[in-house]
Amino acid sequence: MDRRAAIRLIIPVVTFALTLALRIHGIDRHFWMLRDQIRDWTIALGPFSALPLVGPATHVGGYTIGPAFYWILWLIRVLVGPWFDNLPHGGGIGQAMVQSAADAVLLVAIWRRTGSLWVALASTVLIVTAAYDLALSALVWNPMMGAALAKMATAMVLVGWPSRSNAGVAFTAALAWSAVHCYTGAVFAALGIFVSIVAGLFARGDRAGAVQSAVIIAAVVAVLEVPLVVHQMSSASAPPAMGAVTGSVGRILSGEARPQFAASWQGFAGAFTFIQGAPWQPGWLIWVLAGSALVVLVKYRRDPALLAITVLPQILAIAGYAFYVGDFLDRYYYFSLMPGAVLTLVLGLTAAPSPRIAQGIAAAVLLVAVAITPARVRFAATMHRMPEYGWLLDGSKRLVERGHSVKGIRTQFPLPLSADPEFLYRILGGRIDPSAEFTALLTRDGQVAYRK
């Protein structure tokens, strides 16, 4: 293997290892184990045949439109779970592995697409070390899985696999639509990916290939929606999958409400500023992105495939979320847009007429990204951490070692409302028996006391 090939192999491998270590550091002491994580990991602990035909419930009612999240989580439980006693933080490690694999693939894809290692590294560091993303990326949580799959599908487009084979089209489409299965907010990234595949072929003059790819994409989406159709046909009383979305659109189309374009822009701007700007959150950051988008639109106007995975998903999201009526959206709705947004930012900043100047700017952006990483990592450590998890784990292990059943488990320390002090104990093989004589009391130092 020559030196150049070795470098091209080592860099993504190191990227995977470093980003994974960053995400899972201390996870067995602070894993965020609330209602959603308990529900989804409980499902993953069961047999594949018992998995739901639809995705997790949403906080606005209904559920996501397919079971891909549960398929992947079940596979994580089978492959990764046994190494960690099938405890839920093992699921978090598995999900972090998916995220880090997506980061490594995206780095390679940007490198190949732009021909610049500096652009690839700068983009990857900015995406990976975003504090809010870092805080959530090792959870058992469907929005983050959706973001990871959308990231992988974006990478497939950047390396041009869909333009070279029908298998590439089908695989990329399946990844993109599985991201929507995991989290509906990924639909804008998925649509951008679909447009990129078809528009790229049209731009090359391959109209037959473009039409064929569109048919393949439609077929993949149709096949992936079969579980939803089966679920709805077998559950006559089941609510619609995305009732809040269809209800909002219906109210606007009927004239009962108006699209909220200003609120949608503010939601996107606030999310981008927080995700990419925290802990500082400078108000000017969104305008740097907007300026970069204009530069990218001009410079790459003859490259619709690239524009469709960078600028288009952001435009679609701002327009699409304007048709949502209700309290506006949480920042995590926008995670799947961040790879395209960051790549837009970096490509815009490095759009110099001279390649040497462009490379110098990219190297400078990388230096800035590396310089702000420690502050971002520190800020991430202040969000979505549950130190009680470590205390629950220590006490549950000690209780199981003693080998007798208990009436229930209580804690000497307060827990978040939706946490379950008995969940880890049950996974480890402990028995809850209502007729048992004692209730166990877990303490902060991992000790166990008994109360009648």
Task: Please report, for each region that a protein language model flagged, where it lies by residue.
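Transmembrane-lumen/periplasm boundary regions of multi-pass, lipid-linked membrane glycan transferases
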Residues: 43-46, 190-292
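Hydrophobic/aromatic-rich transmembrane helices and adjacent perimembrane loops
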Residues: 136-137, 284, 305-357
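Membrane-interface alpha helices of multi-pass inner-membrane proteins
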Residues: 123-124, 168-184, 195, 318
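Extracytosolic helix-loop segments that constitute the early lumenal/periplasmic catalytic or substrate-binding loops
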Residues: 22-26, 37-64, 68-71, 75-80, ...
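Transmembrane-helix motifs of polytopic, lipid-linked glycan transferases
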Residues: 93-114, 149-152, 292-299
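Signature aromatic-anchored transmembrane alpha helix within multi-pass, membrane-resident enzymes
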Residues: 13-16, 218, 349-378, 388
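Membrane-interface transmembrane helices that cradle and orient dolichyl/undecaprenyl
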Residues: 112-114, 153-171, 179, 349
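Short acidic/glycine- and proline-prone juxtamembrane loop motifs at membrane-interface regions
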Residues: 132-145
